[in-house]
A protein has these predicted regions:
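Active-site loop-to-helix junction immediately N-terminal to the catalytic Tyr of the SDR YXXXK motif
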Residues: 514, 561-569
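Conserved NAD(P)H cofactor-binding loop of Rossmann-fold oxidoreductase domains
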Residues: 502-507
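Glycine-rich flexible loops
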Residues: 1-427, 439, 443
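Residue(s) in the substrate-gating loop at a strand-loop-helix junction
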Residues: 555
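Substrate-binding pocket helix/loop in short-chain dehydrogenase/reductase
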Residues: 510-511, 515-520
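Conserved glycine-rich cofactor-binding loop
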Residues: 433-434
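Active-site helix of classical SDR
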Residues: 534, 571-572
C-alpha cells in the first residue's frame, strides 16, 4: 500500500486550519484522517475512526487534557474540525475503574464531557481511544487485515506475519467492554505498533500523526504482501444462457415496491471482475458465512441473495428466491431479538443480489444508498475471496451479528435518512439542458429525485446541476440513440418513475406559405419524438408494475399560437390528443 503522506501538504493543512484557530495537533489529525478516509482499501462510508490527545484551555484559562475523536458516522474522507468533537480526557480515564457500563450511560457520560455541548456524538469507540496511551490513534477496516482476521486459524496466521509487532484482541462488540479489553492487552504489550481485532479491524498509534499513519500503511502492506503470495486453483462454471437483465431489474423493483410501497434504485454491475466471481463453482458457499466486519451489517445485512442462472428468466422463480430470503431473515430476527430489548425488525430485503454467471445488483432507497451497498459488497467480495486463499473464512456468530445489526448506537447512524416523499424516484427530463428543463431538474434534485437529462449537448448547462444529474447526449429523433439511452438508465437505476417530455424546437413560418418540410421537421421534433419516448417509457412503467408519471410540455403555442408560430403550435397541439 502506497504511503501518501506529504510533508508539504501537512504544512498546508496546519496553515489553513490556523486561520480557523484550529491547533496544529488537530490540523494534522484532520490531514491523516483524510489520507486514511480517501483510501477505499482502508475505510468506507463512515467506517473507521481516529483521535488525537491534546491540551486546551478551559473557560478559566486552565490547561486541560482533551481528546478529539471522530464523530459517529462522520466520513473520514472529508470531515473538518466539526467532525472531531473534543472531550475532557480525565473524566474518560476515570471510567477505567468501572467493571461495567451500559451503552445508554456511556453515551450520556460522553456527551456530558464534551467541550462543546452542540458537538455531534463522538464515536462509539471513544473510550477505546481514550484508554490507549498514545497521542494519535488510527482505526480502519482494511480489506487486507479483514481477510486475515476472519479465518478459522487467524491467530496462527497473524503471529506468523507480524510476530511481536502487534497484539491480537479477540472479538468483543464495540463499546465499554472492548475498550477495557484493549487497555488490558496494550498494558501487557506496550511496545507493539498496533492492535489487530479479530473479526473487526486494526488500530495503530504513535506520538505523531505521521508515525501512527506510517504504522497503519506498514502493517497493512505486510498483510497485502502475504495475501498476494497465496495461490489456489479456482474452478469456474460456463453460463452461456442469455438473460434479459432489464426484465430482471423491473421484476425485482416491482417486488420491492410491493413489499415497502417505496421506489428503489437497482443497479446492474457487470464489469469483468463483477462477472468473474459469479461463475465460481463455489459461489453458493462463498458468501453465506456472515459479514467481514460487523459494521457492514447495518448497510447490506449479513449476506447477499444468490439467484441461480437457470432461474433468472422466470419472474416467478425470482420472486420465490426473494420471498425465501425474506422468510429466512424474519426467522433470524425472531430467533435473536431477545438479545436487544425493544428491537423492531428492519425491512428484510437484500441489498445485494448476485445473479449467477452475469453480475450482481446493488440496491438502495436512493442512488447514494445504492452506491454504499455496492462499495461495501465490493470490499466484502475481495476480502472473502482473499481469505479463502489462505484458509477457511469464518465470521462472527449470528448472535453477535444480530447484536451489532440492531444495536441502537449503530441504528442511530441510519436515522433521518430517506424521509423525503419522492426519495428513490427516477426522473427523465428531455430537453434537459434548456432553461425549463434545468429548472425542473433543480427542483427534482431538492426532492431527492434521481435525475437523468437528455439533450443534444450540455455546453450551457449549469455546472452544479450537471454534477448532480446523469447527462446523456441524445437526439430524440434517432431511435437507436433513444434505445441506447434508456438501456443505460435502466442498467444504472433499474426503472423509471417520471418522464418530463420537455424537448422541442420553435419552427416558424406563416401558414399561408410555409413549406411542407418545415411542418414535417416540426412534427418530427415536437410530436413524433415525444410520442416515441413516451411510448417506450410508458411500457417500462407498465412492466415495473406500479406505473409512473408522464408530463408533456405543450407550451401555450398548442392552444394560443403567436404570429408565424403555426408550424410549432400544430405539432405541440398534436400531443393534446
Amino acid at each position: 500500500m502506497k504511503n501518501e503522506w506529504k510533508e508539504s501538504l501537512a504544512k498546508k493543512y496546519i496553515k489553513e486550519y490556523q486561520l480557523k484557530k484550529v491547533s496544529k495537533d488537530l490540523a494534522l489529525r484532520i490531514y491523516s484522517t483524510h489520507l486514511l478516509g480517501n483510501n477505499p482499501e482502508l475505510v468506507l462510508h463512515g467506517g473507521g475512526n481516529t483521535s488525537v490527545k491534546s491540551i486546551k484551555k478551559n473557560l478559566f484559562g486552565k490547561d486541560n487534557d482533551v481528546l478529539f475523536v471522530k464523530g459517529s458516522g462522520w466520513d473520514m474522507s472529508n470531515l473538518n474540525e466539526r467532525g472531531l468533537p473534543g472531550l475532557y480526557l480525565d473524566p474518560l480515564l476515570k471510567t477505567l475503574s468501572l467493571k461495567k457500563m451500559s451503552d445508554e450511560k456511556m453515551v450520556n457520560y460522553l456527551r456530558s464531557n464534551l467541550l462543546d455541548s452542540s458537538s455531534p456524538n463522538p464515536s462509539i469507540e471513544t473510550l477505546l481511544h481514550a484508554y490507549l496511551p498514545f497521542k494519535y490513534v488510527d482505526h480502519t477496516h482494511s480489506n487486507a487485515i479483514l481477510s486475515l482476521v476472519n479465518l478459522d486459524n487467524s491467530k496462527e496466521i497473524l503471529n506468523k506475519i507480524y510476530k511481536d509487532k502487534i497484539a491480537i484482541v479477540p472479538y468483543v462488540m464495540p463499546g465499554f467492554e472492548l475498550a477495557k479489553l484493549c487497555h488490558m492487552v496494550i498494558s501487557k504489550n506496550h511496545k507493539v505498533e498496533g492492535l489487530i481485532l479479530l473479526n473487526h479491524g486494526i488500530f495503530t498509534f504513535g506520538s505523531s500523526a505521521k508515525q501512527s499513519y506510517d504504522r497503519m500503511i506498514k502493517l497493512v502492506t505486510l498483510a497485502e504482501n502475504f495475501l498476494n503470495k497465496q495461490k489456489k486453483l479456482i474452478k469456474y462454471n460456463i453460463n452461456n444462457k442469455k438473460i434479459n437483465i432489464t426484465d430482471v431489474q423491473l421484476c425485482i423493483r416491482n417486488l420491492y415496491h410491493s413489499f415497502t410501497n417505496k421506489r428503489w434504485i437497482i443497479k446492474f454491475n457487470n464489469k469483468v471482475e463483477d462477472v468473474k466471481f459469479t461463475n465460481r463453482k463455489d459461489l453458493f458457499n462463498l458468501f453465506n458465512k456472515g459479514p467481514v466486519t460487523p459494521d457492514h451489517v447495518i448497510r447490506i445485512k449479513s449476506e447477499p441473495l444468490i439467484i441461480p442462472n437457470k432461474h433468472l428468466s422466470s419472474s416467478k422463480m425470482i420472486s420465490n428466491h426473494i420471498n425465501a430470503y425474506i422468510k429466512k431473515y424474519k426467522n433470524y430476527f425472531k430467533k435473536y431479538k431477545k438479545n436487544i430489548t425493544n428491537s423492531k425488525i428492519a425491512d428484510p430485503l437484500p441489498r445485494i443480489i448476485i445473479l449467477e454467471g452475469i453480475g450482481f445488483l446493488s440496491i438502495g432507497l436512493n442512488k447514494k444508498e445504492m452506491q454504499v451497498s455496492y462499495d461495501i459488497f465490493d470490499a466484502m467480495k475481495k476480502v472473502i475471496i482473499k481469505a479463502n486463499l489462505v484458509s477457511k473464512f469464518k465470521s462472527i456468530n449470528n448472535t453477535d451479528i444480530f447484536k451489532m445489526e440492531y444495536w441502537p448506537l449503530e441504528r442511530a447512524k441510519l436515522n433521518n435518512q430517506n424521509t423525503k416523499k419522492f426519495n428513490g424516484n427516477v426522473a427523465v427530463i428531455t430537453g434537459g439542458a434548456g432553461k425549463i428543463g434545468s429548472a425542473i431538474a433543480n427542483k427534482f434534485i431538492n426532492e431527492n429525485i434521481e435525475v437523468i437529462l437528455l439533450d443534444k449537448n450540455f455546453k450551457n448547462l449549469d455546472v452544479n446541476i450537471k454534477k448532480k444529474c446523469l447527462c446523456i447526449e441524445c437526439d430524440l429523433t434517432n431511435n437507436s440513440q433513444i434505445n441506447k439511452a434508456l438501456n443505460k438508465i435502466l442498467t444504472l437505476f433499474g426503472g423509471i418513475d417520471i418522464l418530463i417530455a420537455n424537448s422541442g424546437a420553435a419552427f416558424q413560418g406563416s401558414m399561408l406559405n410555409v413549406k411542407k418540410d418545415i411542418l414535417e421537421k416540426s412534427l418530427e421534433v415536437n410530436f413524433y419524438s415525444h410520442h416515441n419516448i413516451v411510448q417506450k417509457i410508458a411500457n417500462i412503467m407498465v412492466s415495473q408494475g406500479f406505473g409512473g408519471s408522464i408530463s408533456l410540455n405543450l407550451s401555450k403555442q398548442s392552444i394560443n399560437p403567436g404570429k408565424d408560430f403555426g408550424p410549432y403550435g400544430i405539432a405541440k397541439a398534436s400531443s393534446l390528443f
